[in-house]
A protein has these predicted regions:
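S-adenosyl-L-methionine-dependent methyltransferase catalytic module, highlighting the catalytic core
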Residues: 65-73, 83-183
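Conserved SAM-binding loop
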Residues: 1-101, 111-128
């Protein structure tokens, strides 16, 4: 997992043969070394002398300068039939494009988000990095409860606060319909 943070995603992969993470922040590295010992953690991709079946990157790419160069480096570390799974926020998010919530815009376009991708821009940089057979799927990470938080409280965390009021089914239907807006 490239940009694995505290190792939460890797920690959930109980059936994996090996778990490897890349993370720059020392506090995260120390936490993983002390609390999540099954994860092999490194600070730099160059410190791995092996190839991987799968490389994941969740909400990391938008923080990186030189995205094509980094993607090329990741591609070199993939096995011949390896896959890379990338999750990024969409530049045309519902709360940006349809609702134009100023607070959400300020939250999303903070200084550490260097670029937000669209379908076209993500496919373009992946192609420039040498990836072929590119499949881009839309996924709505947060449901109605989270958006309700933005509409009412004008801040994140609605998925925590409103969780007890909004059923999983309503969240699922809402999220699926937002995905349809992008297709």
């Amino acid at each position: 997992d490239f940009g694995c943070g505290w190792g939460g995603f890797l920690d959930k992969l109980t059936n994996a043969k090996s778990l490897n993470g890349i993370e720059l922040r020392n506090e995260c590295i120390n936490f993983i070394k002390n609390k999540r010992k099954k994860i092999n953690i490194k600070k730099d991709l160059k410190n791995y002398d092996k190839e991987f079946d799968i490389i994941t990157m969740f909400h990391v790419l938008e923080h990186l300068p030189k995205q094509v160069e980094i993607l090329k480096s990741l591609k070199k570390k993939l096995k011949k039939k390896g896959k890379i799974i990338i999750e990024v926020p969409h530049a045309e998010d519902f709360l940006l494009e349809f609702e134009e919530l100023k607070e959400f815009k300020n939250f999303t376009f903070w200084s550490e988000h260097l670029i937000l991708h669209t379908h076209k821009s993500l496919k373009s940089i992946l192609t420039k990095a040498g990836f072929t057979n590119i499949k881009i799927e839309y996924f709505q990470r947060y449901g109605f409860d989270n958006h309700l938080g933005w509409f009412i409280k004008k801040k994140p965390g609605g998925h925590i606060f409103f969780k007890k009021y909004i059923s999983k089914k309503i969240n699922s239907i809402y999220s699926k319909n937002l995905v349809k807006l992008k297709k």
